[in-house]
Amino acid sequence: MADFWGGYLWPAIIIVLQCLAIILPMLGAIAYLTYAERKVIGAMQMRKGPNVVGPFGLLQPLADGVKLFLKETIIPTGANRAVFIIAPLMTFILALIAWAVIPFDAGWVVADINVGVLYLFAVSGLGVYGIIMAGWASNSKYAFLGGLRSAAQMVSYEVAMGLIIIAVILSAGSMNLSDIVEAQRQGVWYFIPHFPMFVMFLVSILAETNRAPFDLPEAEAELVSGYNVEYSAMPFALFFLGEYGNMILMSGITAILFLGGWLPPVDIAPFNWIPGIIWFFLKIALILFVFLWVRATFPRYRYDQLMRLGWKVFLPGSLIWVVLTAGFLVTFDMLPR
């Protein structure tokens, strides 16, 4: 019995607690990201935003959650019931499981694997399936077209994102996310030497998360909300939880790859007195603000413009940068040992 507790059950309980320690705060962060978005965009449009439910509207996300929870789930006639229900669950779960390899501070990671970057890339690549399944299972031409757009868009920008990440891996000499952060401790944050790729990566994560100005899969004027047009109640909410969860995830990945993860801006007092996890969350908040700022500022791209940018600008640009990075590191004997 002691062997069972020590060898199997206790480690399993610890893993479950670690997962809950990430998932529960993440759900709260997603809820209040929707509140922050409405407040920030309201301020940019010179209005108040939500201000009725609770002081300063702080209970608005809870009210929205209760409203969606109490609504009826309607499945359209002719829809594939099983796939229709699985699609939003898949989108939401994939947004959560990627956090297993994200280090919040030195040693603060659930699974510190040596191929953390590959794991993230694999999980983000699977995200498109939930949207395609939703579009196909809804038995609606608008939803189906939105799903196809999403697939083309995400695949197009994932290629460029992969090449940008290769440039960072070459500089750090590791695919372990903690090692990439520690490599930036020795020199400079990678957004300085790789600044063009940093800008490209920011634009690519906007496309990857289907956010404005690349929200073509849910273009209201053309597709009546796109792939989620037939969804209501909690399945509808799960799509938005997945979208906002992916926003936070991509912000965390950007902070790790280019902004030094949990490292302070300068390694001197009083900056290094602040815990690393605080710096990490501040960087995520900064990138999330960029998401909201872009949404309030830029009009939606046309579909052909979106594809042209991905295939004719980002793909060759990131490929050339990888070749230049590799050539520079080899020429000056700066490859990580």
Swiss-Prot record:
GO terms for cellular component: plasma membrane. It is an enzyme of class 7 (translocase). Pfam families: NADHdh. GO terms for biological process: aerobic respiration. It catalyses: a quinone + NADH + 5 H(+)(in) = a quinol + NAD(+) + 4 H(+)(out). InterPro entries: NADH_UbQ_OxRdtase_su1/FPO, NADH_UbQ_OxRdtase_su1_CS. Keywords: Cell inner membrane, Cell membrane, Membrane, NAD, Quinone, Translocase, Transmembrane, Transmembrane helix, Ubiquinone. GO terms for molecular function: NADH dehydrogenase activity; oxidoreductase activity, acting on NAD(P)H, quinone or similar compound as acceptor; quinone binding. The chain crosses the membrane at residues 13-33, 82-102, 115-135, 154-174, 187-207, 248-268, 274-294, 313-333. It is a multi-pass membrane protein. Its EC number is 7.1.1.-. It is found in: Cell inner membrane. The keyword Nucleotide-binding does not apply. NDH-1 is composed of 14 different subunits. Subunits NuoA, H, J, K, L, M, N constitute the membrane sector of the complex. Belongs to the complex I subunit 1 family. NDH-1 shuttles electrons from NADH, via FMN and iron-sulfur (Fe-S) centers, to quinones in the respiratory chain. The immediate electron acceptor for the enzyme in this species is believed to be ubiquinone. Couples the redox reaction to proton translocation (for every two electrons transferred, four hydrogen ions are translocated across the cytoplasmic membrane), and thus conserves the redox energy in a proton gradient. This subunit may bind ubiquinone. NCBIfam families: PRK06076.1-2, PRK06076.1-6. This is NADH-quinone oxidoreductase subunit H. It comes from Rhodospirillum rubrum (strain ATCC 11170 / ATH 1.1.1 / DSM 467 / LMG 4362 / NCIMB 8255 / S1). The gene is nuoH.
